[in-house]
Amino acid sequence: MTRRPTIAIADLSIVAPTGVKLVAGLTLSVDAGEVLLVVGPSGSGKTTLIRLLCGLLDRAGGWQVRGTLTHPGGQIDLAHQDSTIGGLVFQNHALFDDLSAGENLRIVADHRPAAATFQLAATVGTMLGDIDPAQPVSACSGGQRQRLAIARTLLSDPVLLLFDEPNAGLDIRASRWLAETIRELCRESGKPAIIVAHHLDDFITLADRVLLLDPATATLREVPIDRSAIEAAMLATEPGVAAATPELERTTPGAAASPAANPWTRPLPRRSRAWWFLRYLREYLWLLFAAPSMLLYIALGSAIVGFVTIWFGFNYHSFGGYLRAVLHDETLEGLGFLLTMVAVPFNTCLLLVARNSAIIAADLGNRVSGMQMQAMKNLHLPGRGYIVASILISLVIGSLVLVAAALVAAFCTSLLTWMYLFPGQPTEYWQENFFRKLADRHELVSDLGWVALKVVASALLGGGTALLIGLRSRRSASGVTQLIASAIIGGVSLTLLVHAVLMLLQF
């Protein structure tokens, strides 16, 4: 097989936001199919280096980078451009937990040229024979999740494979299998690989070179491929710290299925980008609006508003007594208009924004903290576009539909309450007076337009606030609670402001 040309890094310097120089004047070449093992003490910049090579270093965080990266497709100025050649297998795997095991790979394959994914299909199939494509990734073992992550990265067809602590949490057997798999993949595909690891035993034998990132000199220097020599070099850079040893866990890779029984080898029709967008749209429509709990939540809130408006409107208005019957028609007319144009839309928007802001912030916060958004970027998937567009469209459609449903629920309870207060009266009498101010078709269209404007503006501003908060969150699961609180406060505050301003303009 024809191997790809060498990848070359020239004059690379990396300075952390704290001012610490992690790399200074690095020049490095990586041959096709070569496996490099990068070692060094914690905090020396190993993970920063591979995040730079895969285009995921946060430039807005104050990092200073200089250098060039030459690859088969051209040259990248790392001072101003993100690298697009590195495919990263994340330490926590960063699998998409809302997709099945099969969909995690299929979404990548469907966004790549058919020829590229076809050439890699056989290799991927042999790695995953014991995994049911339909099973949730949460049901996969640690070893299975690792193999899914590697297979998914392979399907994106990167020029350079990058592994961040790939054997963390694996037992000896699983680690050895992983090392052999990486070595074989590099030989067969001609793709070079850079591995960052603290647990060295299984990777020493497969590495073509071992490079030590020395924080004292900010250089990357080659050391002998020998455990004792590597340990001595690491101890010299960080005196008093013992070298890491492999962790043991009871996680083993499953045996590969026979080709005839392997579900991953069956050809599947390609799905379009429109199909994947509709899949995310369906997911968020259900999550934000169509779930039974949501429907019950809105129905209950609207039913209470309908009851309270009629009950207190007739029993506790300023006239009371016998005037309740005398002023019945005018009171019912005003209450019907109030319910339709103000009370129900306002109450429903508050309920929707509060609930959905929490859901959106939690969902995106978990995606960010679980590295799923970064994985989408690294795999060249338009995931952010799919998710943001699906959420915003769901908010508009769902809010309008649920406000309409809420009006129906409020009308029903208001009718039942009225029938209790005025027994023996025909329902036609309620209908005639309740909707009297809405009888003029021209005014009705205008008034409903104002209602729709309030609903859509509340949904977009509330949801947009939750989106911004969720996507800009720190990569920490512990901060999700704060995200939710901030999203609810921001969304509800904007909803109150929107309704106040638009009601003043309307009336």
Q: What spans do the regions from the language model cover?
A:
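Hydrophobic anchor residue at the start of the ABC signature
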Residues: I150
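Helix-to-loop junction immediately C-terminal to a conserved catalytic motif
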Residues: C54
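Conserved beta-strand-loop-alpha-helix hinge in the C-terminal portion
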Residues: A216-T245
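ABC ATPase NBD coupling module
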Residues: G73-G87
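Conserved ABC ATPase signature
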Residues: P136-C140
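Q-loop/switch helix immediately C-terminal to the Walker
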Residues: N92, D98-A114
